[in-house]
């Protein structure tokens, strides 16, 4: 086998059909679109328009609500914090603050604060200070002999 002998399998590369290129091509003049009307033009139909029938998006009831002052927390699991402590990326002798979690690379952005959840095992004594935590996370840290303190989020001051 040589490079110049290589070719696609039969039917693998389908030739493009050039439409509207004269009567001799077989797909000239109307180009397979039929005669006149909106569907024969480019752009075809208006999205969501159902020909005068009440459109689906109007037939269904409105639902839901977006809370304007919703808090978005960066979520961290206890198992990950323990993993970073074991790897030496977080110093467990001092209090583990939100700034320490960001500096270690465990959390990229703080958002409205950091919330700790109980997934994973805690083997050592950890003293954690964060904006939010689940009840089970607080219990798990206390069971391991540490403390999980939930602090009030710091309000961002805007300079006008």
From Swiss-Prot:
Cystine pairings recorded for this chain: none
Record region (Disordered): 1-42
Cellular component terms per the entry's GO annotation: cytosolic large ribosomal subunit
Keywords associated with the record: Ribonucleoprotein, Ribosomal protein, RNA-binding, rRNA-binding
Keyword Ribosomal protein belongs to the record: yes
GO BP annotations, alphabetical order: translation
Compositionally biased region (Gly residues): 21-35
Superkingdom of source: Bacteria
SUPFAM superfamilies noted in UniProt: Ribosomal proteins L15p and L18e (SSF52080)
Pfam families reported for this sequence: Ribosomal_L27A
Assembly with partners or alone: Part of the 50S ribosomal subunit.
Family: Belongs to the universal ribosomal protein uL15 family.
Listed name of the protein: Large ribosomal subunit protein uL15
Naturally occurring in which organism (per UniProt): Roseobacter denitrificans (strain ATCC 33942 / OCh 114)
Gene name of the encoded protein: rplO
């Amino acid at each position: 086998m040589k490079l110049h002998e290589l070719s696609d399998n039969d039917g693998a590369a389908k030739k493009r059909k050039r439409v509207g290129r004269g009567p001799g091509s077989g797909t000239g003049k109307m180009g397979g679109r039929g005669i006149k009307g909106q569907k024969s033009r480019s752009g075809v139909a208006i999205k969501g328009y159902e020909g005068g029938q009440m459109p689906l998006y109007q037939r269904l009831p409105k639902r839901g609500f977006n809370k304007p002052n919703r808090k978005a927390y960066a979520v961290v699991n206890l198992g990950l914090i323990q993993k970073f402590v074991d790897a030496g990326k977080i110093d467990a002798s001092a209090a583990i603050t939100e700034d320490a979690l960001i500096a270690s690379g465990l959390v990229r952005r703080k958002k409205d604060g950091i919330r700790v959840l109980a997934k994973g095992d805690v083997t050592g004594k950890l003293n954690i200070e964060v904006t939010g935590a689940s009840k089970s996370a607080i219990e798990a840290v206390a069971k391991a002999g540490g403390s999980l303190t939930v602090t009030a989020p710091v309000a961002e001051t805007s300079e006008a």
